[in-house]
Amino acid sequence: MNTFDINTITRENVKSLKPYSSARDEFEDFDTAEMIFLDANENPFQNGVNRYPDPQQNSVKAILAKNNNTKQSQILLGNGSDEVLDLLFRAFCEPNKDNIISLPPTYGMYGVLANINAVENREILLTTDFQPQVEKILEAVDENTKIIFLCSPNNPTGNSFSDESVVKLLQNFKGLVVIDEAYIDFSEKESWLTEIDEYPNLVITQTLSKAYGLAGIRLGICYASEAVISVLNKIKPPYNVNELTQQRAKERLKDLDKIKQEIASIIEQREELLKVLLEVNFVEKVYPTEANFILAKVDDANKRYNQLIEKGIVIRNRTTQPLCENCLRFTIGTKEENAVVIKELKLLN
């Protein structure tokens, strides 16, 4: 049994911090519809956004909690998932002392945020089939290791990590295991959200930028124990999610049928593109995927990338990433966009 204790990993200055209290925080338990607000030095003339937004985004959290069978107190929202990830560093990692573990090839912001926050990033490569090397990860852990980052389904490889590997890390690591589920909606695997109450050191990040089609509003989600969320709430900026973002998110989150249709279309087009890539003569390998993209190994990634750019098709060249030499990542577009990509791929020499 993992004897995880939030107090042992929280930074001392954060533990003693008295968080900033915004004007609106003081009235969250009141019916504010008829109240006159003269407390925050706002412009009083109504235009839809003249007032500060709800600092706790309660109406958005209520929908997320209902949709995912969790509690509002287990949710933190951020200005994109990157803000959520940054808050984790700032709450739990002491600069120039602590370290985190990431598993390349993976999402690059874990390493970037480690550098920004003066935290050592210990990289443990995935296996050749892109699975965690659990024993090597645990061997790399020391008393100053605060977070292990797992991206599952993984970017840029597209595959999910085995349940056995994740459980072993959750059970044997006394810091936070952060599972980045940005692409979970495209996978047949169940989200780790169902295990939050089982593992107090489990943190899950999700986003509205992928399956929900709201990359432009920047809304990231963190699910964790109430203890972890309470620490993050102490250090988050008071109005980190603006009113327009909150309104648009609520509209979209209530339209689950349309979202499911779009996800189904993306998965259908993913399978179409996958079949074509397997037949293209310069494609050497197509990796299994549970995301809205496909990673393919080609004969010359730089050459093929530039050829597609000349045709007006922008993909991602991942050849500089560990274990991804000569690999290209194809995001799945609409049926019409996919048709153009397929046509041009067949014409390339």
From Swiss-Prot:
E.C. no: 2.6.1.9
Cofactor(s) of this protein: pyridoxal 5'-phosphate
MF terms (GO), sorted A to Z: histidinol-phosphate transaminase activity; pyridoxal phosphate binding
Modified positions (N6-(pyridoxal phosphate)lysine) in chain numbering: 210
Disulfide bonds: none
Keyword Transferase assigned: yes
Keyword Coiled coil tagged: no
Reactions performed catalytically: L-histidinol phosphate + 2-oxoglutarate = 3-(imidazol-4-yl)-2-oxopropyl phosphate + L-glutamate
Root EC class: transferase
Pfam families the UniProt entry points to: Aminotran_1_2
Gene3D superfamilies linked to this entry: Aspartate Aminotransferase, domain 1 (3.90.1150.10), Type I PLP-dependent aspartate aminotransferase-like (Major domain) (3.40.640.10)
A biological process from GO: L-histidine biosynthetic process
Keyword entries, A-Z: Amino-acid biosynthesis, Aminotransferase, Histidine biosynthesis, Pyridoxal phosphate, Transferase
Pathways involved: Amino-acid biosynthesis; L-histidine biosynthesis; L-histidine from 5-phospho-alpha-D-ribose 1-diphosphate: step 7/9
NCBIfam families: hisC
Assembly and oligomerization: Homodimer.
Similarity section: Belongs to the class-II pyridoxal-phosphate-dependent aminotransferase family. Histidinol-phosphate aminotransferase subfamily.
Name of the protein: Histidinol-phosphate aminotransferase
Gene that this polypeptide is encoded by: hisC
